[in-house]
């Protein structure tokens, strides 16, 4: 059944997919009811119709000729019960069910496919003039009589389009096949349940029997609610595939309301859970098998018949399809324009990382289990791998979210963010592969060791219902695969590998949180379904080891989604955007919660939006604990950022200034130092690379030409105030005259931040005569501008404050490398410049930024300035203020 939406606000019919359609005048007077239009452009008023249950089983509704035939066919199934052998009855009903199921999926499917592609059924009607009153043929007369018996004697067949009349006849074939399919299935259920003296209530404990019946009945009732809700939503038009024959004006879009907002294709997915409820009540693997058989054929019907027609009628236009293709190709630019490895999908023999993943997966999944001595060792390996993966991935994402460690490291080494993200994707996928390979290997080892023993079921927590466990386990494993690929289809590889943590929104094709695909129905589909495959493995092999692994997988998944991923998404897109109701939540609120509770929840949410936090963030009661934990983490990180371990300035002064020098005849004064503030205990300072002039005075009678001054770090000399036992490493000068001065610059300076002092030494020895006041060498603060238009001014500041202190360039456009290559050690020069830039701008870069210049080696100061602006732009887009979380 297809499903459409009634868009009452639309007044223009969208014929994007039917370019040749023209609209003619209605063929009958306008009356109440929806307006239809055929694919040839003929418009008409669609008369009211009834569903098959009301049509066939409501005694107040007059039955048509075909409907009487259908009822006769349905009741004829009772003749089978005249056979006394119940097993033969089961075989007969199974054969009948298979016949009707094949008639449904392949018979109706073939008719619908040809109607969609070739207008086959309508062409037949026109070819044989089935609705022409002048046609006196037996077939035409019987079909016309059938329509009149449906619509009444006053129904004017000729006034209605052939398409609509053909649809009315097609409906009766659908009624016959669908009702016969369901009735024969119910007969199989009944016969299977009562065989062997009502086996469905025997040979089991009472609690288990009641549990089966209650759970099975619940599935059946839920199935019934799905069908009723679906029919109330899409009406007869879509229930009977009306859009294969004509269109209803203002029904140009797919509907996502009611149960259609809860799960994708509910008529084909959860619309069959009742079949499994019947199997549970009947306690029959036969019923389970034919339920799986019928459901499988229905999914084939959906894939090959329903979906192609939906895409044809309601799908995107050619331009939209091309746009989608382009976006998917853009998604691959982060992965060298190749689909990245996900598990072992998209494997490429030409990628070294793929080969390594394959080797590791085979090693941990097959080779190690073949040679392992015990299951315990495999269990320890699996737990160890999962803990390693959980801690490393969660810690990496947390640090990237708050501190951008991966991005900063990459940009500092002049590595594009796309490349760093690609490397992260390889690491992430490799660790995930190792965990699942280890889990598979543990269970393979268990199978190999137990299969040869006398009691293969020993060690299992339970060993009953093996085939049921295998079916449910494989179903859960398949569900995880399906969910994972659905997630990738919705958010791309960018979203799958947490691209929001690494790539700024301006450089990504994803600007907002998606609500398409599987995310239309669930906000976090991977919350449960992302690990349900591990639960499936536990069902197949219910060992203690697998139970522990399920716990590890679930806990890690919960922490990663709720405390890392969701926290980052809230700060990036806003809490209201992230916490919007999913389709399932909307459906539960609308259809399954009492109205009084709905009003209360609506009032609570409205109150919270108005009287919530100072930032206007919406909170829900179920999120209070999680938010409080997340806020505690934020507070901890904020305190960590704001904390410092600097020694007090007064303590530094006490360490530096030896009071015994207060009345000394020797003096040292430092010229050109700057004051940090007006407070007396604040150290004077200079900036890195700025020459420092020191003046000395010594008594003439005691002066020696071998007196000398050295520059030292206080933290290295504070333990010895009267004698220096540390080398000055070349940062010294002779004091040949009793009075004089000397400029410390270039190699005689420390090119790093810290607190320093000058020491006056006597007669070429290390005896200290005087220690200067302490002073601080600190980085100049340079603000990186927001826009590239300010790059020239910023480059001038870089040249003045940093480059001119190391190398001499004539202007900001001159190439750096030719001048730097003239130095004795060009790498050290680059390291020094990059260090000064990093400290001055608070943007970390490494010397490699000067090496990745291309073939022309024309990197200039202006180019460096532009690179810094770009890096700042990337980091700011990925960052947020912890104390002021973003809200939308």
From Swiss-Prot:
Protein name in the entry: Phosphatidylethanolamine N-methyltransferase
Record-listed E.C. numbers: 2.1.1.17
Topology, Lumenal side: 1-63, 113-173, 227-261, 306-354, 399-423, 492-527
Major localisation: endoplasmic reticulum
One Gene Ontology cellular component: plasma membrane
Gene label: CHO2
UniProt keyword Manganese, yes or no: no
Pathway(s) where this gene product acts: Phospholipid metabolism; phosphatidylcholine biosynthesis
Record's keyword terms, sorted: Endoplasmic reticulum, Lipid biosynthesis, Lipid metabolism, Membrane, Methyltransferase, Phospholipid biosynthesis, Phospholipid metabolism, S-adenosyl-L-methionine, Transferase, Transmembrane, Transmembrane helix
Record GO biological process: methylation; phosphatidylcholine biosynthetic process
Pfam families for the chain: PEMT
PROSITE patterns, alphabetized: S5A_REDUCTASE (PS50244), SAM_CHO2 (PS51598)
Reactions that this protein is recorded to catalyse: a 1,2-diacyl-sn-glycero-3-phosphoethanolamine + S-adenosyl-L-methionine = a 1,2-diacyl-sn-glycero-3-phospho-N-methylethanolamine + S-adenosyl-L-homocysteine + H(+)
Subcellular compartments: Endoplasmic reticulum membrane
Cystine connections: none
Transmembrane domains' residue ranges: 64-84, 92-112, 174-194, 206-226, 262-282, 285-305, 355-375, 378-398, 424-444, 471-491, 528-548
InterPro entries: Phopholipid_MeTrfase, Phosphatid-EA_MeTrfase_fun
Purpose: Catalyzes the first step of the methylation pathway of phosphatidylcholine biosynthesis, the SAM-dependent methylation of phosphatidylethanolamine (PE) to phosphatidylmonomethylethanolamine (PMME).
Lineage: Eukaryota, Fungi, Dikarya, Ascomycota, Saccharomycotina
MF terms in GO: phosphatidylethanolamine N-methyltransferase activity
Segments on the Cytoplasmic face: 85-91, 195-205, 283-284, 376-377, 445-470, 549-888
Membrane disposition: Multi-pass membrane protein
Assigned protein family: Belongs to the class VI-like SAM-binding methyltransferase superfamily. CHO2 family.
């Amino acid at each position: 059944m297809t499903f459409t939406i009634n868009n009452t606000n639309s007044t223009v019919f969208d014929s994007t997919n039917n370019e040749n359609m023209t609209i003619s005048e209605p063929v009958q007077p306008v009356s109440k009811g929806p307006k239809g239009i055929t694919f040839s452009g003929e418009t008409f008023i669609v008369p009211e119709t009834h569903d098959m249950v009301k049509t066939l089983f409501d005694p107040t509704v007059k039955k048509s000729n075909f409907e009487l035939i259908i009822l006769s066919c349905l009741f004829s199934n009772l003749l089978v019960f005249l056979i006394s052998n119940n097993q033969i009855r089961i075989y007969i009903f199974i054969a009948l069910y298979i016949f009707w199921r094949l008639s449904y999926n392949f018979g109706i499917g073939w008719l619908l496919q040809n109607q969609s592609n070739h207008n086959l059924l309508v062409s037949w009607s026109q070819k044989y003039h089935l609705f022409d009153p002048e046609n006196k043929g037996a077939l035409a007369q019987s079909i016309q009589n059938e329509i009149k018996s449906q619509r009444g004697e006053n129904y004017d067949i000729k006034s209605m389009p052939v398409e609509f009349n053909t649809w009315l006849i097609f409906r009766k074939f659908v009624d016959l096949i669908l009702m016969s399919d369901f009735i024969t299935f119910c007969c199989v259920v009944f016969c299977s349940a009562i065989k062997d003296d009502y086996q469905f209530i025997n040979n089991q404990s009472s609690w288990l029997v009641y549990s089966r019946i209650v759970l099975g009945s619940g599935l059946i009732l839920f199935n019934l609610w799905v069908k009723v809700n679906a029919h109330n939503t899409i009406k007869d038009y879509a229930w009977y595939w009306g859009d294969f024959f004509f269109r209803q004006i203002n029904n140009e879009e797919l509907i996502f309301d009611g149960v259609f907002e809860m799960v994708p294709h509910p008529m084909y997915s959860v619309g069959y859970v009742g079949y499994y409820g019947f199997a549970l009540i009947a306690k029959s693997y036969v019923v389970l098998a034919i339920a799986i058989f019928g459901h499988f054929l229905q999914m084939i019907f959906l894939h090959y018949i329903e979906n192609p027609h939906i895409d044809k009628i309601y799908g995107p236009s050619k331009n939209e399809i091309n746009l989608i293709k382009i976006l998917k190709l853009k998604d691959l630019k982060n992965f060298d324009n190749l689909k990245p490895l996900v598990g072992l999908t998209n494997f490429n023999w030409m990628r070294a990382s793929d080969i390594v993943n394959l080797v590791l997966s085979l090693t941990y999944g097959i080779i190690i289990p073949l040679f392992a001595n015990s299951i315990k060792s495999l269990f320890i390996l699996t737990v160890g791998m999962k803990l390693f993966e959980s801690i490393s991935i969660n810690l990496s994402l947390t640090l990237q979210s708050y501190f951008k460690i991966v991005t900063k490291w990459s940009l500092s080494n002049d590595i594009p963010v796309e490349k760093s993200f690609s490397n992260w994707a390889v690491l992430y996928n490799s660790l995930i592969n190792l965990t699942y390979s280890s889990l598979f290997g543990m269970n393979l080892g268990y199978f190999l060791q137990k299969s040869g023993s006398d009691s293969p079921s020993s060690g299992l927590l339970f060993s009953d219902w093996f085939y049921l466990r295998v079916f449910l386990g494989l179903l859960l494993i398949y569900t995880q695969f399906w969910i994972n690929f659905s997630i990738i289809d919705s958010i791309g590889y960018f979203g799958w590998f947490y691209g929001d943590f690494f790539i700024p929104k301006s450089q990504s094709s994803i600007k907002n949180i998606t609500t398409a695909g599987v995310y239309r129905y669930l906000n976090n589909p991977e919350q449960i379904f992302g690990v349900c495959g591990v639960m499936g493995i536990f069902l197949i092999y219910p060992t203690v080891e697998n139970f522990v692994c399920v716990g590890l997988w679930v806990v890690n998944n919960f922490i990663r989604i709720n405390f890392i991923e969701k926290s980052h998404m809230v700060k990036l897109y806003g809490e209201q955007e992230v916490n919007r109701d999913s389709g399932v939540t909307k459906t539960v609120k609308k259809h399954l919660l009492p109205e009084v509770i709905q009003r209360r929840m609506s009032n609570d949410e409205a109150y919270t939006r108005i009287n919530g936090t100072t930032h206007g963030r919406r909170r829900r009661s179920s999120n209070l604990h999680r938010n409080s934990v997340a806020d505690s983490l934020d507070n901890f990180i904020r305190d960590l950022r704001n904390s410092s371990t600097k020694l007090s300035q007064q303590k530094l002064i006490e360490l530096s200034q030896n009071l015994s020098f207060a009345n000394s005849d020797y003096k040292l004064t430092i010229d050109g130092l700057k004051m940090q503030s007006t407070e007396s205990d604040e150290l004077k300072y200079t900036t890195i690379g700025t020459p420092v002039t020191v003046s000395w005075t010594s008594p003439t009678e005691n002066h020696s030409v071998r007196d000398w001054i050295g520059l030292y770090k206080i933290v290295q000399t504070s333990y010895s105030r009267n004698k220096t036992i540390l080398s000055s490493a070349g940062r010294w000068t002779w004091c040949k005259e009793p009075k004089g001065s000397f400029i410390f610059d270039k190699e005689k300076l420390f090119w790093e931040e810290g607190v320093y002092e000058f020491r006056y030494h006597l007669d070429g020895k290390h005896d200290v005569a005087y220690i200067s006041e302490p002073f601080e060498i600190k980085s100049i603060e340079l603000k990186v501008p927001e826009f590239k238009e300010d790059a020239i001014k910023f480059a001038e500041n870089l040249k003045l404050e940093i480059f001119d202190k190391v190398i001499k360039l004539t202007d900001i456009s001159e190439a750096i490398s030719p001048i730097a290559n003239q130095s004795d050690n060009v790498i050290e020069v680059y390291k020094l410049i990059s260090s000064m830039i990093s400290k001055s701008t608070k943007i970390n870069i490494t010397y490699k930024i000067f090496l990745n210049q291309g073939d022309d080696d024309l990197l200039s100061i202006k180019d460096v300035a532009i690179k810094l602006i770009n890096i700042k732009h990337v980091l700011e887009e990925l960052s947020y203020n912890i104390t002021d979380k973003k809200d939308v």
